[in-house]
Amino acid sequence: MKKKMLALLLACLCLSLAACAKTEAPAAEEAEQTQSTETAEAPAEETPAAKEPAAADEAPALSGKVTVYMPSPAGLADKLAEAFTTKTGVEVEQFQGTTGEILARLEAEQANPVADVVILASWSDGLSMKADGQLESYTPANADKVNEGWIDEDSMLFGSSASAVGVIYNTTVVPELSADWAELADAQYKDMIAIPDPEKSGACKDFLAGLVTGTADGEAIMQSWADNGLTVPGANKAALEAVTTGEKGILIAGVDYNAYSSMAKGEPLNIYYPASGTVVNPRPAMILKTAPNMDNAKAFVDFLFSDEAQKLVADAYLLPDRSDVQCENRTNLSDIPQITTDWDKMMEVASDTAAKLNSLCK
């Protein structure tokens, strides 16, 4: 009897356990399905987007310094340097001098180059540097706006500004003057005429080269000036000073920006460009192949063609390099009569012509 009772209890227990199992299985399945649904409906965790690689032509971050050799006017050089540093954070180390002084310094530093960018007041001297293989090719910003012919075909010389030479005269000595180049050899101007030293003044050097290659009687004109008492007081500044003080009445081939600046200060001077034409001399900015700070050098050349730099150029009485920038304080490029220039021919004769003029005046 006891065995029957035990068997009955075991049977009831098994039935009870089976019922529980059937009840829990759907619950487990339901929970599993709910979890699966929640997982599917939950938004996927966002993966941070990968950073796009920098563009290959993106300008590098600038730092450090750039060394620039610049001719006068000194005030312009200082303002350009200050503005560039403010814009980029790059310090500008300068050497300021005449074209002759800059070239001499470059020659002395050949074994240990220092300069990154060189600006000269002589396009022919820039061409000589190019012929010697010293320059880096580059296409600066706003190159499409530059006056025609002010960037060479290999994009190594960039006319960042320009000057023209004219006849500057002291109005207390010579009240009115409009003589052409050859007419300045007239006896009425005997011992009154001076000229900047063409071996120191790049602008005068290029003018004489243009005179002898672009006219039929350039060398004869030089000789006639010498016969009429032409003197060479020094580079541009010294030569202008001789006329400003009245020591001489007339300056042949004086750089125009100096005249306009002095006139604005009230000096008794005037300037004109002879009707037969003069030489407009783009002042080449050049990047040296040996530039220790190449990226900064390119950035500085880009800056020279910017709106800000071109305004500084115009304010200094120089001709801007961009055709869309006009001057209000001097004669504009389109109003200056010009000799037809062949810069390759001028480069070949420039140094010898400058030396000859000096020898004629001794």
Give a label for each model feature.
Residues G166-V173, A209-V212, N281-N293, L304, ...:
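A bilobed periplasmic-binding-protein/Venus flytrap-type ligand-binding module shared by bacterial periplasmic
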Residues T278, L288-T341:
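Mature extracytoplasmic/periplasmic domains
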Residues K2-T23:
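Sec-dependent N-terminal signal peptides of Gram-positive bacterial secreted proteins and lipoproteins
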Residues S124-S128, G249-P268, Y317:
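A ligand-binding cleft/hinge motif common to bilobed small-molecule-binding domains
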Residues T67-D78, G97-G100, P113-K248:
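Extracytoplasmic ligand-binding site segments that recognize negatively charged/polar headgroups
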Residues P48, P53-L62, T67-V92, V167, ...:
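Short, polar/charged alpha-helical segment
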Residues A18-E29, E38-A40:
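Bacterial lipoprotein signal-peptidase II cleavage site
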Residues E148, S163, Q223-A226, V232-P233, ...:
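Periplasmic-binding protein-like
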